[in-house]
Amino acid sequence: MIKKIFFLSIIAISCLGLIAEELRPLSWSEKLNHRERFYPVSSGNMEISWDAAEKAVCFDIRFDNGNDFWAYPRLQFKDGESLADVETIQFEYKAVQADEKAGYVCALATFDSGKSILLPNPKNKWQTVTIKVTEVTKEPGKVSYMAIGMNPKSSRLTYWVRNIKMFGNGKASAPVNTAGIVKADVPGMVFTRNEVLEFSLDAYIERPVEWILTDWQGEQLATGEWPENGKGKLSLPRLPDGYYMLKLQSSQVAFTGSRSFVVVPDPDCRRRNPDAFFAVDSAQVWLAGSAGYDAAAEIARRAGLVIVRDRMSWSSCEPERGKYSWGNYLRSVDAFAKRGISVCNTWHDAPDWAKNGNKSIPGDMVAVFRFAQELSRTFKDKVRIWEFWNEQDIGFALDGAWDYAAAMKAAYLGFKAGNPDTLVASGGLSKTDLINYSHVMMQNGLKDYFDIFNLHAYAGITAFPNYLSGIRSYMKRYGISGRRIEFTEVGSVIEGSGRAAGLYGEFKAHSPEQEMLVAEFLPKLMLNMQNLGVDRSFFFVLLPYNEQGGAKDWGLLRRDFSAKPGYAAFSNMMNELGCAELEGTLRLGKDIVGFLYRQPDGTQTVAYWSLSDCDVKSRDAVLNAQGAGKIFFSIPVKEGIYSGTNIFGTPFLAESKSGKLTLQATSMVSYINGLSGLKPVTQFHARKTTGSPIQVDYDRTIVYHVKLSDHFEIAADKDCASVKQDEAAFILEVWNLSDQPKKGRLQISGGKVIGLPGEIFVPPFGKYEVGLHITPKFDGNGNGKICVAGVFNGENTSPLLIPLLSLEKMMKASRTVNFPQMLDPANWRRNASARMEISFDKTEQAVRFLTDFPKTGDCWVYPEYVFQLPQESLRGALGIAFEVKVQEVPAKGFYQMLVMPVLDTQREKGKSFHLRTKAPSAQWEKRYVPLNSGGFNPADIRQIRIGLNWPAGTCCYWLRNAQIIYSR
């Protein structure tokens, strides 16, 4: 991705050049002149198409506001396509932009070798470019991609590229990855039962080739010679559902790897349950590219999905007030709708004109209402669930929990106004232990403004019982026990960072073993969550996606859009259990898990497996070796032949003799069907759920919003505001989100208020605004609150509540204990995702933490201080204070600081709580982190972690002057 050009190593070339007579175009370069070969990379919205008139690939880019305009679509070389035997690269290109007089900053051909070649100034006429490979790199065999693009000076750019040719001697050198050359004309390499299993090879493999078909365990099923020396089409006999692999052999070519494919039931023949528990987060509007919406939606359909999760952007859909442009968002939803798949959709941005003083959460309540109303009206019958925001309790929102609650109220009212039948979900909370932020949300009267309580979790299976216990207690506390519980994101972290090289250089990929781990984990997690009382779970994510600098590989599809084994596992789970009702658990034997389901026809199905790392570990699980974990067990059923399927849907038969059906459990889930008469050992009781009340005994349409002055400072966790002076100013907005005028009086508690008006009038879909001053009332620990309520047209309103903290009053009323022990490196335990050093810095009089992270990966450093009990007990602690600084603030990337109280003494073990604090600068700064804000008792804290999430490279930070503040 090229945003600035001054740092590039640029080599100027002439646009003409003669190809030496002894060189010839390599046959594989013909494959490069297709739009499918280019991956969109730009600072705008890029559409890639084939221009038949020009016989060229066309790139059309619209840029958003700003001046950083660039477009460098990536042409990734596949297996068998190597610059090792290329002497020169030749292509033609031309370009036009919205303002032709504006000109171009530059045009470049870039390579992952780090070199960029300056191209002739773009013109609206064809120019031929020739590049010598020796000017690009000294190791051409290691170049994995090139990009042809430019930096225009106006907001619309269209350019074409054609006749890409690689000239060389044509000698084969690099091994060929089978997955890169075996093709099939089906989306995602996913065949339905009734489709012909037909494959072809890229044209440049023109020599005798042997194919070998295996199952997922590597057992050979068939073999033969590829038709016409690799130039023909290979048709395999019909195969049952399952996950399969094609391998290639040749005496003339070194093939590596395999080409996997999946066989699934015909979607038109599947039973469908619109309320199915099992779902997937597709994210296709962002990850598929508009040209891929239909293909991605068809892959979802073939998995049996009835609902998927997707995204929207308010800023893109309504850049100007009242001017809507649904564009790709509508096209994406339509791609699902025409396949009978409904959508759960979310957005978590706001145009600047709607923020009304907020940093990220919209503060214009009428604007939120109108946009939500237009969404639910426009997408009626296509989008079944609307979520407002995403992970607002962490970095996706920068404003207070009270700001989120106000906007959530407005969104709910708008959604219901546009379509009363739509379901509204609260924004997915990332902190499943429900930190204080989530409590402040509900204390702002949010309970009647959503139908679905929505969470996200990325953890091992063993974490979920505690999660659900806490969630149920939370819901009971706030009177929402009857609401649906849905996890709109759950994903696997047990396999760790990708261990294989990816299709794109900086993106790592799962190894085959890691892919199988995710396949094993997925149904186990889903069934356990269902048994714990979750109402629906969306697995993250269908389409290929990388995070953590490219190290973490997500997606049930690979970067080439082929299905991983996890996709096949999900498809079969959906086919077996998507319409079934969970009855409970079975006791099948030691180390065997069994879940009992009842099918619509009254028969029963048992899902079973043997315990493995996937069941007990939160990360770094190891795939069972073939043959490990196999345990025989019996089920008491009447005599007969019963059918079942393995994890990927491949059928098997089992015979019951003498009233016993003997089966073999492995670490992979299997299903046995057609049973009857079985009783669960632990019965599952489905919760009776209801949505938000249609009517309430107060006025739901009055919504309060506050603009705090700089007399306040919002805490890093966004759950309270500290007050800097005795009398503090703020602006109160009263929004009327109804078509009726409202007259009433305000009620503000929590201190002495100056400027409170008498009776006020709020017009329909309007607001009343007033500036106020408050002298807050604080308790003995320095805690207070602002609470706004009122009575309008004779009805009470939903409240606004802002927790307050006076650090000055808290410190005066508390007892401060210095902790010089934290200066001793020996008292800290190393805990980081890379090698770290802990030392005492005499100059700074501080403990120093130094960690060298790789260029990519999950970079975190959280050294652990274990308290010596009872002398270091935190019983009665109000908070922890310390000074911190970093050697250098990272220029980019995810950067945050957390303080983690932990209820255990072991390294990386025990329940922990993630308390955010402001990320440090390169200067000494003081931090205070409350330890009494809910969720845990400070007396139970056994260790504390104080550290950072870092983008990459060297991380160095210091801590000093640690203090624990206790109540007197």
PLM segments and residue spans:
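Aromatic-lined carbohydrate-recognition surfaces of secreted/lumenal glycan-active proteins
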Residues: 281, 408-438, 478-496, 534-546
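Aromatic/acidic polysaccharide-binding cleft in carbohydrate-active enzymes
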Residues: 492-571, 585-591, 600
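N-terminal substrate-binding region of glycoside hydrolase catalytic domains
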Residues: 264-374, 387, 393
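Carbohydrate-binding surface patches
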Residues: 587-640, 729, 735, 740-742
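Extracellular ligand-binding interfaces
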Residues: 63-139, 155-160, 165-170, 856-936, ...
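Short carbohydrate-recognition loop motifs
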Residues: 46-69, 837-860
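C-terminal beta-strand-rich structural cap/linker in extracellular carbohydrate-active enzymes
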Residues: 656-705
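Active-site cleft segment of glycoside hydrolase catalytic domains centered on the general acid/base Glu
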Residues: 168, 320-323, 328, 354-473, ...
